[in-house]
Amino acid sequence: MSTTTMNIASAPIEVKRIYWPKSTISYTDSGYLVGWKYSTNDLIVVTTITSYQSFANFLVDYCKNQDQSVDIKSLCILGTFNCSADILPGDKYEIDCWIKVQQSTELSHPRVFDSASTPLKINLHIIYYHPPQPRKMQFLSLEPLSLLLLKDSFINKSNPEYESMQHQQILLKKLKLHFPRRKENSWKRSLRSGLIELLNQSFEVRMLTHENNNKKNSYVFRLFDRVSSSTFYFFNSLFAYFIILLRIINEVILLAINYRPIPLSYNMMDIFVSARQVDLRLQQACFWPVQYMKLWVFRKSKRVAIEDYKEYIRFYNNLWLVANDMIFGITMSSFILENLHLVVKLIENITFEYAIKNVRSMVIWLVDTPAGLKLNNDICKFIMKLSVWVIDVWSNFLLHCLPWTPFLVQVVAISGFGGASLMIALISDFLSVMTIHIHLLYLASSRLYNWQLRVIYSLLQLFRGKKRNVLRNRIDSYEYDLDQLLLGTILFTVLIFFLPTIYVFYAAFALTRVSVMTCLAICETMLAFLNHFPLFVTMLRIKDPYRIPSGLNFEIVSFEPLKQDGFATLYLNCNSKPMSLGSMFEHYRKLARRLISHYLSKTTLISLLVGCPVPAIPAEQLYNIQYAMLPTKRISIRKLRDLLFHQKKFPYD
């Protein structure tokens, strides 16, 4: 025994991996082991057969089929299971990897014994795996599932996030050059997409080898298929024409939303949040027929492809989001319509109380030594009269629009039938319109305050004998005349005395504007929640984690030491690692980081301190994740017609 051990230790010991289905092969079975030889060191066991002739007939029948959903041609017999002696079949077996497996009880592990066809001593790794069921949309994957269309043509390459991602990929490629390549016979090198694809096909191959080939082909069934197919064709044609009609209406609305009267001017999407929301929903509606046809072809051809699963999850996640959005919208719409008078009265009170009266009272209060501050009376009265005039003009305009308030509330309520997101977008637009006077006062005060700071900074440079060189973008020394210094001193003194008064009014209007922007940010957060929440993915994660994998998890089960008639065997469990909550809400966290980095960033704080206007977050940053699930160029009406009636090639493949 010691001599054998020494010889084995001196010789190079190979490691072979056998992927064993955990639930499909029982200890009571016996016969030949059928599977794939992925490589010299990787064997995938699928099932057992009792007769080689039936297996040969199965290969002949299915190899004639051109539209194969699984890899049948490379199937072979890998060895025997619970057989007393090695019985070599015909020519469809692998002599260099022939294995002899025994399993005595249900709780015991399968043991691989030495045979004459395996002269070398090897170490075995038997990996138990659960064959994923394709009809239940189960599959294994090495990488987390992505809901985005990861194609170069669909990615905005001008986005800073894309540039950062490209930079990280370049660094990773350079980092790999500093490390030697691993050996082929290692876990890192053996786990490849081809092997995972074979594991995904194992369940369907087992069902094909054990299925009953008796098919009902009587005249009654043929007649029923003929009548039902003609009936379905008639209704499908009507439905296809209806989809094309809706596509034409969508195209007209999309052209109106994206129309620019003058090149480089603003369109409706750049001005209104509701227009952006309508554009998103119509773009999704244009892409849904393409997604549905791809899924229909996928189910008809019985293909097993991870990309089809991703398309399935993307499609139904959008449908569930839109369905829940409409449910919430109809609920809110019914509540508003039932309490129309109360809602109208509440809106009028809020608008005139907080947006008009309180702002007007604040401006008047700033004239009379606010918080004990002694301000310049003349400047205070001038700014106060100008601000009150703007507020009164806007108040009179709102009073003229007051009879239209019930109608506008009804419009917002009816928009809820298009989804709660559209209602929230309209509320955000109405809030922006109702507070135009606050925005104008904030812009005027910020411009005045920023201009005053710039002039004071320039006068400080004058006292230091410096002058800004605009052509070279630097500060050079300069000798000023006496009259220039005297005039600069007078202007500096006047501006310094005016600065507290200007700053107080600017701070008041900036605080009011920040309050309005906070309300708009809340609306944007709610829109992001309704547009990006992974509802369908969360339901799949709770119902069946195998449908949203994010990798593989290997766990050591047992170890059998080296024996005289066997091999040193390590038993492992290969389980699909479901997608974590962090990965599911990764896009949501990106949106939260964008909102926080925009409104609570250092740049925003500095802009408020120096009087630079703080704009709202760009719509591209708020919606680009949802648009990433859509193609950049929507399908044309002609291609949609060809796809529905002639089933031509998909435009986004």
Swiss-Prot record:
GO terms for biological process: GPI anchor biosynthetic process. Pathway: Glycolipid biosynthesis; glycosylphosphatidylinositol-anchor biosynthesis. It is a multi-pass membrane protein. The chain crosses the membrane at residues 43-63, 237-257, 327-347, 382-402, 407-427, 485-505, 520-540, 605-625. It is found in: Membrane. Its main location: membrane. Keywords: GPI-anchor biosynthesis, Membrane, Transmembrane, Transmembrane helix. Pfam families: Gpi1. Disulfide bonds: none annotated. GO terms for cellular component: endoplasmic reticulum; glycosylphosphatidylinositol-N-acetylglucosaminyltransferase (GPI-GnT) complex. InterPro entries: PigQ/GPI1 (IPR007720). GO terms for molecular function: phosphatidylinositol N-acetylglucosaminyltransferase activity. Necessary for the synthesis of N-acetylglucosaminyl-phosphatidylinositol, the very early intermediate in GPI-anchor biosynthesis. This is N-acetylglucosaminyl-phosphatidylinositol biosynthetic protein gpi1. The gene is gpi1.
